[in-house]
Amino acid sequence: MNYLKVLAILSLLFIFCGSVYGAGEADSPDINGVNAVIDDTITVENASLTYDKLITSNNCEEVVIGDNSIWDVPIREGPIVENDNTSIPDITLKGENGNNMSFNNPADVFINESFNFQMVFKNLGDATGFQPYIQLIAPDELTHFTVSYSNRKIVPIKVGVFNESTYDNTTGLYTLRDPFTKKEVHGPANSTFYILQYPLGSFTVDAPDAVLNITSGIGVLEIGKLLNFTVTPVFRYGNSPIDDPVNYPPIYGETVTGWVNPVVVKIDKSSSLNEHETATGSNFPFSYSVNINIANGAKIENITITDVIPSDVMYLGSPVLYDSKGRVIDSSLYTIEEPAGNKTGGKLILKLKEAVGDLSTTSITLKYKAYAPEFDNSTGDNITIINSETGEGIAAASTVDMNYTYVNDTYNASNSYSIYLKSLATQKYSEILTGSGQLHPVVPHNLIVYKIDFEISDYFAFDDLVVYDKFDTHKVGSAQKFLSEYEPVLSIYGKTWELNESYYSVVSLGDIDESVTFYISKFLKDNNISTSLKGGYYTNRSVNQGAMVGSLNFVAKVIIHYSNGSSVVSNDLVINHVKTSATVLNTFNTVSDNSYTQLRVPSVTLKKDIIAVNGEIINDTDFYKVYPGQNITFVLDIHFPTGSVNDFIVTDFLPIPLFNLKGFNLVNSTTGVIPKGGYWAYANDSGFLYDENTGKVIVPKIGIDTFNNALSFNFGNTLDNMAHPVDVRLWFTFQVSSEPMADQLNLANLAEMKFKDSIDVVYASSNIVLMLTNEPELEITKYVNDTKILENIENATEVEYNITITNTGHSAAYDINCSWWFC
């Protein structure tokens, strides 16, 4: 056999490749959904060949006809690009609580109900990956999947079920094929194979995490028996934008297992107390609530709830059982064993024959009243709960336990809860008011009304009560000004008084105040209102003088700068701390209590869209069809609630190779005019940001990152002294490239913004626009006109070939280059 001549024959038979490039202008006839037929004749010389099968070529794939071949020849597979860089797909699973859904920390999920979790996709490699998707293998107990990415719905592709029809006797495995990679995928019996495809063509190294929000559900399962599913991240095209599995095979990440714990009951305990604290004494009663949530449609029986009341708390009675709609349940349907009325602590035991869950967040609620007395008498001795000399508060912990039967098996659920018992308790509140009195988010120049409530235990009396209020945010200082024109108002003993400047002092830093201190006891003494603040039973344990409570209201203004000179910007927390302190009467011991409020400045928001194609304004749509050679104009709509933000940068990650950043012009073209390809501009209705240092309009710094195919606009630190909202609209235009890529791909073009607050916490948010690629896609068929001639092939035999090229894609193909070669 002549090796070279055999290769020549084989090359003509099956080694043929077509290349398609979409040019801006057609230099040759185009192919648009029609066939192009090429006839060619070749003379074969010095051939010596025997065979008993025919190999032809269809789309550069071998099609074998016949039985066995004695041919033994190398097959050309195309050039292999040597590159050590690679993409590495990675996936993590996050439950509703933000924790990983691991074996040791499974997600507790109600049977017969839906639950939410997230799949977070990353590229941990050092090269761009293409066409990311997730292989999901889920047991049949997971009843459905609803998927979204950046608020856009993604429809899961159900590949099939691993059942008897997919069982491979040879390997002993249940086997399906991934329709994207054509590779085998194995799974447990009766599990289902899904594909969750991101609408992302390329996924660069520095691209933000791609988060899928998943809603699934489970049916009626064995309680406590862990359920698991697996996810495997894949780059379908590996490190290449085109489907070239020989040179760029799919890249798989590590398979991750998510764990779910089926539950039928969840229980928790809470109270009506603000900040979970109370002054002691019967003048400060509160309610405990035992909240039971039962899975939808689940019937539980033989219910016993045992609520262990702390020995520091006195049960007051009045137990009431409510259903999921807040209706009182007939007391004849349950029994309650109550603690002894003259003893602290004890157990409240409720027995209920049965209950059925629904989709409400709470199926049954048990409420009862209690208070913190002076003594713990649960052991028969009167033990003082709060030391009468120091007045130091304590925590009172309680537990609730529930036993029940579900489908003839007994289960248990429990929870613990603590409240804080104090001699002096303080809570703080804040409210933002406009001139009309309407609620409003906090921004610089707003007025904040602060309210401080305080309660004094029935068994204590205090002198020298002082309220110290500090305007302070960690690291940056104060950004508030106490407004003396709004006189502080003190409410106590059922009356109100305005406090003049004799009864408060301000630590001022000029146009900013650091703190204000209010002298409550001094005011009461100077005005002959009271010499000390005494609890209701302090003077006589048998005579109730009523609850000793008070409140203090005052107004502060938010300033544009902090005391350290930095600006109040988006996402900042405007924080206010309060500390009340007083001396226990007839002692030298001081008691204090703290509280605080925080209000957040609104965040920047981002929206991305396509506004024009080839310079013409277009209407909104879910998917934009894009074709090679088109000029696509994108718009970034960025809303700045106060015009002030730190280190603001917005980065647009453009799909590779759909758009090419090379040659992009860094200079703004004419504002208000749709820019031509490779340019950017402010929109005609855009606002502008101002530099924090110079006060001038900011021209953003343009960044070109060819590695990540990313365009960035860096505005740095911005400041609007009047805190006016600003809407910035940026236009930029790119031409759809003629680089080969797949047809009819749903691609997401992602833009991400990042910025910092005043204490350098970084915030990020992203938005996408969806595009549908319309590319040429050629099918190539080559065959010998007369195959009989091959049966008696000899030197000088003429062989005539037909080559047919068909465009099955959605865009015309130009500059068709057809190549064949002999090896």
What are these model-derived regions, one by one?
Residues 16-34:
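Sec-dependent signal peptide cleavage junction
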Residues 2, 38, 59-61:
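Generic short amphipathic/hydrophobic targeting helices enriched at N-termini
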Residues 34-38, 42, 69:
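Short, ordered "entry" segments at domain starts
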Residues 44-823:
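Exported/extracytosolic protein signature
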